[in-house]
């Protein structure tokens, strides 16, 4: 029976949202995995049973992770299915990031000995009597999982066990997962993995992959400690209706389960394992064969070039304004000595007496700036560590753990920035300000997250955060982040208000009638287009890693895009700010925040488009979860980009009004 899927089988991998390569030295190239073990994940040596010692193990443990599907947002633990279960074994401890991502790694009943090959070894047999309600429920859950194409995720020596097959253009794709089984519809259409064999042909029938051929490749250690190191673990899923279940021989027809089957159904789970020495692959680069099979590296470079063109265009525009227009304006303004000349002032200098007038809703703006600063620093530091290889796919859950810990510890700059600007806006309710900074934005995110978690609890999904973890998150928030925010706010309020280069008039200047293009809404809508143009290709891969369970590892690209996004948001906001000041509209504070923050609205529109055009998600719960988590990402992105725009515009306005002579 052939086990190679044709090109029509979708290329899918596990969700490893580990958004790690050195920015310059290891931007993805011919060997994208070479930087993964730089921080020092220690290798494990394996020996045969006769040579085992404390430094060299003989037993190879296979762990199982949660099962997931691209047609459902709901992952499930391995134990939720009626598969063969481990009789003993210690469950690996999981970090905060793994728990938040829904990973549930458990020991499996599959036990191997290094270099000891086995053929058609029986693991267990499951028997179902369809007239029994409990058995029927288990069988129906198994059928539903095959219908939704749920995938196993197995782990050997911290490496995913991969299913490698050819996709389009004879390219090999190594999927770090394999399906439970597949389904032939009542019209004879083969769904998902059922296309791999002509033996899967019975209508309205499920075929379960109850046998796996596992091949483990190893590299012999030439120097130092004796033994070998595992460099790859691959498998081929197969289906057999074993003639003699007690002594299976892994031959015969496929294991089919008719949708209308009744009576007794027996499923025997078996495996075969072989070992192969691999001289060309070193342990430090053992992820390469998986990562090199991932497509779209050339598209990533196109994305970078596209973004750089936008940055160069904006930089040219800003340079022209700063070096020519502003330089001439400032020179002309500074040469005006007579009252008659002063009366002929026009453009942005006319509003010098109102440019630093406190904005409306200054409390809310300062709170947004504090939270945005927290997110901005967190993102930069997280991506920096990712580029150094600390947050690679081999270090499971590290990315999310790092982000959460950084967010908690960055309460101080959030409180400081919020307090500093609120005081500069003339605010006096410092207690309200620090409380809102501590609880408003984090509270919205947590409330959304908690509602999503209730849905996951109700569905029995492994992605549901345990009660103890929720308590731990609340403890981090209330016991560490909030006090740090108060400390930052204390120092922010203690300092003098920000000194502006020009005084503010007592009577506000009337803003003249604005043209369509200088009105607030058109400018805000236009301001988000260019920043979004820099990230939308990268956004596709990030959404794929989250919702389509594809591996993301190109942190070098992502860090470059992050820098480009910061520059683009800054320059686009400065450009529009200048045009509005020339139109004598001095309400720049909220406008600068919303101009770059509007990029998040384009993010939301793209996420909606992605849901309907790219995903195969079905079910009300999965749809609610998708848009619930999307709203969290949109809010975080809004605060992140809006803060960049405000700081850029604040610097620009302070700079230009500090170099003109004002009586």
UniProtKB/Swiss-Prot annotation:
Main location: membrane
Database matches in Pfam families: EMP70
This protein's GO CC annotations: endosome membrane; Golgi apparatus; membrane; microtubule organizing center
Topology Lumenal: residue spans: 29-300, 396-398, 459-466, 544-554, 613-631
GO biological process, one term: glycosphingolipid biosynthetic process
Protein keywords: Cytoplasm, Cytoskeleton, Endosome, Golgi apparatus, Membrane, Signal, Transmembrane, Transmembrane helix
Transmembrane segments: 301-321, 375-395, 399-419, 438-458, 467-487, 523-543, 555-575, 592-612, 632-652
Membrane topology: Multi-pass membrane protein
Subcellular location: Endosome membrane; Golgi outpost; Cytoplasm, Cytoskeleton, Microtubule organizing center
Signal peptide: 1-28
Cytoplasmic side, ranges: 322-374, 420-437, 488-522, 576-591, 653-663
Keyword Transmembrane belongs to the record: yes
Protein's job: In the intracellular compartments, may function as a channel or small molecule transporter.
Membership in a protein family: Belongs to the nonaspanin (TM9SF) (TC 9.A.2) family.
Name under which the protein is recorded: Transmembrane 9 superfamily member 2
Organism: Rattus norvegicus
């Amino acid at each position: 029976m052939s086990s190679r899927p044709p090109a029509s089988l979708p290329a899918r991998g596990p969700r490893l949202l580990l958004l790690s390569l050195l920015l310059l030295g290891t931007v993805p190239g011919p060997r994208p995995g070479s930087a993964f073990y730089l921080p020092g994940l220690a290798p494990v040596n394996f020996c045969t049973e006769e040579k085992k010692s404390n430094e060299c193990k003989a037993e190879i443990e296979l762990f199982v992770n949660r099962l997931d599907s691209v047609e459902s947002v709901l992952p499930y633990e391995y134990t939720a299915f009626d598969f063969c279960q481990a009789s003993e074994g210690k469950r690996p401890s999981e970090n905060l990031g793994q728990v938040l991502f829904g990973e549930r790694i458990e020991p499996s009943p599959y036990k191997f000995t290094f270099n000891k090959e086995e053929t058609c070894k029986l693991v267990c047999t499951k028997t179902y009597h369809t007239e029994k309600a409990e058995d029927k429920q288990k069988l129906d859950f198994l059928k539903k999982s095959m219908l939704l194409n749920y995938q196993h995720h197995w782990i050997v020596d911290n490496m995913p066990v991969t299913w490698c097959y050819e996709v389009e253009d004879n390219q090999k794709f190594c999927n770090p997962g394999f399906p439970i089984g597949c389904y032939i519809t009542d019209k004879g259409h083969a769904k998902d993995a059922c296309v791999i064999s002509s033996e899967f042909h019975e209508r309205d029938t499920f075929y379960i992959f109850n046998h796996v051929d596992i091949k483990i490749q190893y590299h012999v250690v030439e120097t130092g400690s004796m033994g070998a190191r595992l460099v790859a673990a691959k498998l081929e899923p197969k289906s057999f209706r074993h003639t003699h279940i007690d002594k299976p021989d892994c031959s015969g027809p496929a294991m089919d389960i008719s949708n209308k089957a009744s009576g007794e159904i027996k499923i025997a789970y078996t495996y075969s394992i072989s070992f192969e020495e691999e001289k060309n692959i070193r342990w430090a680069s053992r992820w390469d064969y998986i990562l090199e099979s991932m497509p779209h590296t050339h598209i990533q470079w196109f994305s970078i070039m596209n973004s750089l063109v936008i940055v160069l265009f904006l930089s040219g525009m800003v340079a022209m304004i700063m070096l020519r227009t502003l330089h001439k304006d400032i020179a002309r303004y500074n040469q005006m000595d007579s009252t008659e000349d002063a009366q002929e002032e026009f453009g942005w200098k006319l509003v010098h007496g109102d440019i630093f007038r406190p904005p409306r809703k200054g409390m809310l703006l300062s709170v947004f700036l504090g939270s945005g600063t927290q997110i901005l620093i967190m993102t930069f530091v997280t991506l920096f560590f990712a580029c150094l290889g600390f947050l690679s796919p081999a270090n499971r859950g590290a990315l999310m753990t790092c982000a959460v810990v950084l967010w908690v510890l960055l309460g101080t700059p959030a409180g400081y920035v919020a307090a500093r600007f609120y005081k500069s806006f003339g605010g006096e309710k410092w207690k309200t300000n620090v409380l809102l900074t501590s609880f408003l934005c984090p509270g919205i995110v947590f409330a959304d997250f908690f509602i999503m978690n209730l849905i996951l609890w109700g569905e029995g999904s492994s992605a549901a955060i345990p009660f103890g973890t929720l308590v731990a998150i609340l403890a981090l928030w209330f016991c560490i982040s909030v006090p740090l925010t108060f400390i930052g706010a204390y120092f922010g309020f203690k300092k003098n208000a920000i000194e502006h280069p020009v005084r503010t008039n007592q009577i506000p200047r009337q803003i003249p009638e604005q043209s369509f293009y200088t009105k607030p809404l058109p400018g805000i809508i236009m301001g988000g287009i260019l920043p979004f143009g820099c990230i939308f290709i990268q956004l596709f891969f990030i959404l794929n890693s989250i919702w389509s369970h594809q591996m993301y590892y190109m942190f070098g690209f992502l860090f470059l895009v992050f820098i480009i996004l910061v520059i683009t948001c800054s320059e686009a906001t400065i450009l529009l700010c200048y045009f509005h000041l020339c139109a004598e509209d001095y309400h720049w504070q909220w406008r600068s925040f919303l101009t770059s923050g509007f990029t998040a609205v384009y993010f939301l529109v793209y996420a909606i488009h992605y849901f309907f055009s790219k995903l195969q998600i079905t079910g009300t719960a999965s749809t609610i979860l998708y848009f619930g988590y999307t709203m969290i990402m949109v809010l975080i992105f809004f605060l992140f980009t809006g803060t960049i725009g405000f700081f850029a515009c604040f610097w620009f306005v302070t700079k230009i009004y500090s170099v003109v002579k004002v009586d």
